[in-house]
Amino acid sequence: MSGRGKGGKAKAKAKSRSSRAGLQFPVGRIHRLLRKGNYAGRVGAGAPVYLAAVLEYLAAEVLELAGNAARDNKKSRIIPRHLQLAIRNDEELNKLLSGVTIAQGGVLPNIQAVLLPKKTQKAAK
């Protein structure tokens, strides 16, 4: 007697909730943090999956834009300046992260139009 009952099938290999949802972010860890954080008395099974998907999407969006900013500056490594440029040049991300200060991010280059030198018209010859 093997002690496995009538079926006789071996237990399937454990599959993480992240891999089931097709995500890279940890669903189990987010679920644990939601339960621990006293956000609500109970946490549904779908809530951490949804939150992990949203966080993964936002991270991918910021990283893609920051990678483009790094490539524009002929750099192969993303630095805080590239994150700052990526976020502040994107309207929706800028609105979402308007209250966030990025250390070593610098500022966006911006010169008011009235401060620019006036265009002088050359005499026609």
UniProtKB/Swiss-Prot annotation:
CDD domains named among the record's database cross-references? HFD_H2A (cd00074)
Where can this protein be found? Nucleus; Chromosome
Q: Where are the N-acetylserine modifications?
A: S2
Basic residues: bias regions: 1-18
Q: What is one cellular component GO term in this UniProt entry?
A: nucleus
The family database entries (InterPro entries) matched by this protein are listed as: Histone-fold (IPR009072), Histone_H2A (IPR002119), Histone_H2A/H2B/H3 (IPR007125), Histone_H2A_C (IPR032454), Histone_H2A_CS (IPR032458)
Carrying N5-methylglutamine, the residues are Q104
Question: Per the record, which residues fall in region Disordered?
Answer: 1-21
Asked if the keyword Acetylation belongs to this entry, the reply reads yes
Q: Name one GO molecular function term.
A: structural constituent of chromatin
Q: Which PANTHER family match?
A: HISTONE H2A
Q: What does this protein do?
A: Core component of nucleosome. Nucleosomes wrap and compact DNA into chromatin, limiting DNA accessibility to the cellular machineries which require DNA as a template. Histones thereby play a central role in transcription regulation, DNA repair, DNA replication and chromosomal stability. DNA accessibility is regulated via a complex set of post-translational modifications of histones, also called histone code, and nucleosome remodeling.
Q: Indicate the family of this protein.
A: Belongs to the histone H2A family.
| Self-association and partners | The nucleosome is a histone octamer containing two molecules each of H2A, H2B, H3 and H4 assembled in one H3-H4 heterotetramer and two H2A-H2B heterodimers. The octamer wraps approximately 147 bp of DNA.
Q: What is this protein's record name?
A: Histone H2A
What broad taxonomic lineage does this protein's source fall under?
A: Eukaryota, Metazoa, Spiralia, Lophotrochozoa, Mollusca
